């Protein structure tokens, strides 16, 4: 059986280019699915406009079956906000789109187990669409329409934070498997962190709040910024 690290590595190339929050969510989905005995592979992440147009032509002006109704610019894949998945088979190299498969033999179809975890994280599922059902497709719109995205709009910091909050509970469970430590600022405990290989990890927001600083996430730059607030009477 493949290790979690091996399963994650198989999807690494296709996760490249995704919006940071979608990347975190897709990674969490791989981890949660693996934990219940359903390893998955991300088969598609970011898709360029040209690649989308070529896919749209399939079954229309090019050989093959129709697999999408979206032209270039009309898919969340084109903005790094969508990912497609398949079930990774026990041999570690083959995949399956069999929605009736129950490899972990728990009475629930593996495909739907993955979908349940995906929705809990905040993904929208293409299988819920009423017209063209796209069962491998998962996306996060962050409240933005495709028309919004075509004009250059980006997910807001608040929308991104909401996704992070949905992922956090499972991350905190994983945190407890490491060496738990109390993090203090000026003698006052502000949070529980964890120690791994000599490095202490703690939520940046807890540190900034304890220091009376402001914290902001800038999606376009994929940057978390902590800004200290000068004390009254301080000389700068």
Where are each of the predicted segments found?
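Charged, often glycine-rich, active-site loop that binds/positions anionic groups
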Residues: 51-71, 137-147, 230-232
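Anion (oxyanion) recognition and catalysis
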Residues: 34, 119, 209
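Extended, low-complexity, intrinsically disordered C-terminal regulatory tails
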Residues: 30-64
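Catalytic cores and adjacent binding grooves of peptidoglycan-active enzymes
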Residues: 70-172
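Primary recognition of N-terminal secretory signal peptides and signal-anchoring hydrophobic helices
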Residues: 165-236
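Active-site acidic/histidine clusters and adjacent loop/turn architecture
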Residues: 1-44
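Soluble non-cytosolic domains of exported or imported proteins
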Residues: 16-24, 46-49, 104-112, 197-202
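Short aromatic/hydrophobic-glycine micro-motifs
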Residues: 38, 60, 122-126, 213
């Amino acid at each position: 059986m493949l290790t979690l690290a091996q399963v994650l590595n198989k999807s690494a190339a296709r996760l490249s280019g995704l919006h940071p929050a979608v990347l975190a969510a897709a990674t969490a989905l791989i981890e949660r699915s693996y934990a219940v005995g359903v390893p998955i592979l991300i088969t598609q992440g970011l898709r360029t406009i040209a690649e989308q147009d070529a896919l749209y032509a399939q079954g229309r002006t090019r050989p093959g079956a129709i697999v999408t109704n979206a032209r270039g610019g009309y898919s969340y894949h084109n903005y790094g906000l969508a990912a497609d998945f398949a079930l990774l088979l026990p041999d570690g190299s083959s995949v399956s789109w069999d929605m009736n498969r129950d490899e972990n033999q728990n009475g629930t179809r593996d495909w739907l187990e993955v979908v349940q975890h995906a929705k809990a994280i905040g993904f929208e599922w293409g299988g819920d669409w009423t017209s063209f059902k796209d069962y491998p497709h998962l996306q996060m719109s962050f409240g933005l329409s495709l028309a919004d995205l075509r004009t250059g709009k980006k997910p807001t910091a608040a929308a991104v934070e909401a996704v992070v909050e949905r992922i956090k509970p499972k991350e905190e469970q994983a945190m407890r498997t490491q060496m738990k430590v109390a993090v203090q600022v000026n003698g006052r405990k502000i949070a529980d962190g964890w120690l791994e290989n000599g490095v202490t990890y703690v939520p940046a927001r807890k540190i900034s709040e304890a220091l009376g600083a402001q914290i902001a996430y800038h999606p376009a730059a994929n940057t978390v910024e902590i800004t200290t607030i000068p004390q009254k009477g301080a000389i700068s």
